[in-house]
């Protein structure tokens, strides 16, 4: 999973979201990750709270964040710290605590939004997105999947035009997309001359590989993708690799669209030779529709056009091979 570390701060928070982590070990790896891989410096209360969570002191972490919020109820860093407590509780499978803390985080953030837009800076949208994500996953874990979807869809109505839209949509898809018709792909613009057409995909199993030009994990995963395409392509598998512009190249923000397109094309040529024969639709609407707040995101679609796997983050060849074997069966 790529945590948006290569995106300049002004742009980074618009597209970043933490990948859902099923177990405590995965969460601890994130909690102990270098600060350079996180949003901003995240010193102070966020760092101390995350350290307490890594030490499995969830109560102490919560008390620390709440004390900071008593002193300054609208402090963005303290709100983000509290959201991390909910994430830590979820990773530790303490679902009741995760739900309670995430609800508290949401309530506190909503109470200060009359003072500022959600996207005035990066930390509050990260905290609110995490609050909804943790609530949804905790509710689902407690057997209340319908309530989780109601929560997420209500949040989408209110925040569907903000930076947390893709994260909310991702969580809706995690709970409900399997077995449903694949969301349509926007194909008005492609990166290369290879076009995605209905004729090329009708009745074919699909692997959708959502990637970003700055994404290190995507560059690593393409080796796995190349191996699997060579193995399953002759059996009918079609690979599609949607991407989008992000408005930056390295540390430069507000890059013109044509210049960024050239940069994406050069990145594709250098790091993704496999994608020379793969359609690459270029549109932010595809990322919005599929809830891509994590790159890569992988989606497997069967011959009937139904989604069988929706996975934010990297998968190994060992994980993908049995899924693809089932997918390509006539």
Model-identified regions with their sequence ranges:
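N-proximal helix/coil linker or "cap" segments that precede and/or mark the start of modular domains
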Residues: 142-188, 199-202
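Alpha-helical segment of the N-proximal tetratricopeptide repeat
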Residues: 43-67, 71-72
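Short active-site neighborhood of thiol/selenol oxidoreductases, capturing the structured segment around
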Residues: 195-221, 225
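Structural microenvironment flanking redox-active thiols in thiol-disulfide oxidoreductases
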Residues: 219-271, 279-286
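Flexible helix-coil transition and linker loops at the boundaries of alpha-helical arrays
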Residues: 69-78, 108-125
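Thiol/disulfide oxidoreductase modules built on the thioredoxin-like
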Residues: 271-323
């Amino acid at each position: 999973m790529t945590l948006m570390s290569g995106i300049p701060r002004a742009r980074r928070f618009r597209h970043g979201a933490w990948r859902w982590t099923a177990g405590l070990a995965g969460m601890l790896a994130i909690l102990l990750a270098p600060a350079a891989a996180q949003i901003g410096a995240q010193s102070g209360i966020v760092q101390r709270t995350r350290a307490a969570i890594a030490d499995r002191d969830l109560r102490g972490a919560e008390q620390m964040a709440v004390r900071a919020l008593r002193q300054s109820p609208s402090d963005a860093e303290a709100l983000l710290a509290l959201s991390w407590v909910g994430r830590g509780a979820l990773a530790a499978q303490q679902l009741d605590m995760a739900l309670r803390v995430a609800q508290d985080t949401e309530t506190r953030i909503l109470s200060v939004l009359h003072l500022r837009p959600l996207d005035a800076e990066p930390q509050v949208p990260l905290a609110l997105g995490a609050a909804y994500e943790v609530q949804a996953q905790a509710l689902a874990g407690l057997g209340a999947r319908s309530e989780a979807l109601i929560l997420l869809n209500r949040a989408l109505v209110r925040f569907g035009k903000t930076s947390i839209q893709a994260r909310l949509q991702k969580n809706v898809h995690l709970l409900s997309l399997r077995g449903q018709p694949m969301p349509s792909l926007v194909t008005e613009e492609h990166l290369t001359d290879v076009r995605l057409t209905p004729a090329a995909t009708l009745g074919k199993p699909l692997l959708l590989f959502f990637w970003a030009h700055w994404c290190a994990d995507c560059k690593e995963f393409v080796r796995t993708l190349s191996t699997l395409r060579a193995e399953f392509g002759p059996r009918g598998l079609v690979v599609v690799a949607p991407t989008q512009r992000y408005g930056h190249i390295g540390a430069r923000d507000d890059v013109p669209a044509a210049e960024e397109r050239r940069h994406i094309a050069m990145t594709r040529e250098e790091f993704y030779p496999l994608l020379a024969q793969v359609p690459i639709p270029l549109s932010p609407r595809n990322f919005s529709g599929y809830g891509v707040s994590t790159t890569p995101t992988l989606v497997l679609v069967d011959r009937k056009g139904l989604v069988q796997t929706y996975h934010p983050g990297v998968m190994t060849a060992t994980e993908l091979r049995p899924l693809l074997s089932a997918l390509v069966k006539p």
